[in-house]
UniProtKB/Swiss-Prot annotation:
GO terms for cellular component: cytosolic large ribosomal subunit. GO terms for biological process: translation. The gene is rplQ. This is Large ribosomal subunit protein bL17. The keyword DNA repair does not apply. Part of the 50S ribosomal subunit. Contacts protein L32. Belongs to the bacterial ribosomal protein bL17 family. One of its GO terms (molecular function) is structural constituent of ribosome. PANTHER family: LARGE RIBOSOMAL SUBUNIT PROTEIN BL17M, RIBOSOMAL PROTEIN L17. NCBIfam families: L17. It comes from the Bacteria.
Length: 116
């Protein structure tokens, strides 16, 4: 039974949700910060933390797992080159979520998620 095993649904089927999280993760690591809804920012936070932890490990197996998840190969190589020195003293909490103004069209809660 799957009692209390909740994942953020984000109003999408599982395949679309996974693709969305992969795309948001790739773009956040590429650009350093992105603007999205608060629910999506909270959902992507754990995926980004997982990728940075893989990059801190630095092994070939970790690199291959990151390449299998993220959409952009040069971004993965840049992450693996940069993350071990940038986050060596930090054991998690690699992102910061800052709430911003609500979206004009549908009044959705918006946020900026950025790498610390």
């Amino acid at each position: 039974m799957r009692h209390r095993c909740r994942v953020p649904q984000l109003g999408k089927p599982a395949d679309q949700r996974k693709a969305l999280l992969r795309a948001l993760t790739t773009e956040l690591i590429r650009h350093g910060q992105i603007k999205t809804t608060k629910a999506r920012a909270k959902a992507v936070r754990s995926e980004v933390d997982r990728m940075i932890t893989l990059a801190k490990d630095g092994s070939l197996a970790a690199r291959r797992r990151a390449l299998g998840y993220m959409y952009d190969k040069p971004t993965v190589h840049a992450l693996f080159a940069d993350a071990p020195s940038r986050y060596k003293d930090r054991d998690g909490g690699y992102t910061r979520i800052i709430r911003t103004l609500r979206r004009r069209g549908d009044n959705a809660e918006m946020a900026v998620i950025e790498l610390v």
